[in-house]
């Protein structure tokens, strides 16, 4: 990862310019401390969800937690992890979405860290910072290939995964039917955004310093320039307010955001 000279990590400012810079926030103490460490938790799926592997274009394999639709379906929801990795909270969230979508959609929570899972801030920061964009893209492309050429794919993610939810939609091409990003770093390049084949629902936190209101405003402007549709909601909340692994999540804001995301995803995947 290359740090742009114009980007600084003073704890009082810090607006990352792209996903690579966002990952370097792992070195920022204020950013690390904005993530409460998850409590120990073991998830047992009640709907047949299980870990699986899929091939990636670079000749390797990647991991995912898959909940198969009750009846054969080409519809998929990709779930992108927080900076902790594909932990049991994300698996639980994947099953929550599986049930919310009435078991009619395949739900795949994608392991972006190749098996590494953090339980503390130091390890989470280390894993996020070490994640290499070429490999991350290969993992996403492998998941898209697994879904198949005729798949209809929507995505959702938080923080690190919020940025990758949008990048996933870009990589999905014509298979993309929806994208929900929770306080993730938006893609800034208008030419890239022009290739989007779906609209975007962006859920953001008004009290945070990193994916700030200014970053959101720039994203809206860039999407307009790209002639793409985006709906944004800025909650009066802190970064990570709705993270599945957050033991101190904002209950009211999380519930409202979930309802927004649910209405959006049901419209794109069930209608």
PLM-predicted stretches and their roles:
Residues 226-271:
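C-terminal catalytic histidine-bearing segment of alpha/beta-hydrolase fold enzymes
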Residues 12-45, 50-147, 245:
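Serine-hydrolase catalytic machinery in alpha/beta-hydrolase-like enzymes
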Residues 202-204:
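Short beta-strand/loop motif that positions the catalytic acidic residue
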Residues 92-93, 212-222:
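Short alpha-helix in the alpha/beta-hydrolase fold that links the catalytic acid
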Residues 147-158:
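Alpha/beta-hydrolase fold nucleophile elbow
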Residues 157-161, 165:
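Gly/Ala-rich beta-loop-alpha elbow adjacent to hydrolase catalytic centers
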Residues 207-211:
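Acidic catalytic loop of the alpha/beta-hydrolase fold
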């Amino acid at each position: 990862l290359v740090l742009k000279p114009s980007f600084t990590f003073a704890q009082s400012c810090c607006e990352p310019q792209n996903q690579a810079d966002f990952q370097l926030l792992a070195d920022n103490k204020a950013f690390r401390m904005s993530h409460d460490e998850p409590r120990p938790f073991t998830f047992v799926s009640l709907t047949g969800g299980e870990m699986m592997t899929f091939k990636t274009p670079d000749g390797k394999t990647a991991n995912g937690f898959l909940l198969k639709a009750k009846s054969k379906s080409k519809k998929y929801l990709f779930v992108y992890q927080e900076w902790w990795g594909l932990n049991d909270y994300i698996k639980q969230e994947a099953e929550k979405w599986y049930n919310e979508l009435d078991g009619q959609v395949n739900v795949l929570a994608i392991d972006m860290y190749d098996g590494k899972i953090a339980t503390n801030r130091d390890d989470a920061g280390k894993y996020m910072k070490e994640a290499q964009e070429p490999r991350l893209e290969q993992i996403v492309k492998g998941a898209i290939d697994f879904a198949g050429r005729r798949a209809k794919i929507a995505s959702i993610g938080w923080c690190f995964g919020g940025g990758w939810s949008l990048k996933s939609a870009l990589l999905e091409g014509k298979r993309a039917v929806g994208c929900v990003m929770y306080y993730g770093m938006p893609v800034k390049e208008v030419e890239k955004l022009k290739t989007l084949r779906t609209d975007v629902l962006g859920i953001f936190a008004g009290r945070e310093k990193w994916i700030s209101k200014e970053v959101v405003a720039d994203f809206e402007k860039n999407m307009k320039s790209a002639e793409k549709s985006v709906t944004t909601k800025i909650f009066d909340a802190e970064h990570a307010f709705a993270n599945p692994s957050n033991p101190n999540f904002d209950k009211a804001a999380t519930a409202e955001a979930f309802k927004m995301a649910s209405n959006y995803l049901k419209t794109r995947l069930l209608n």
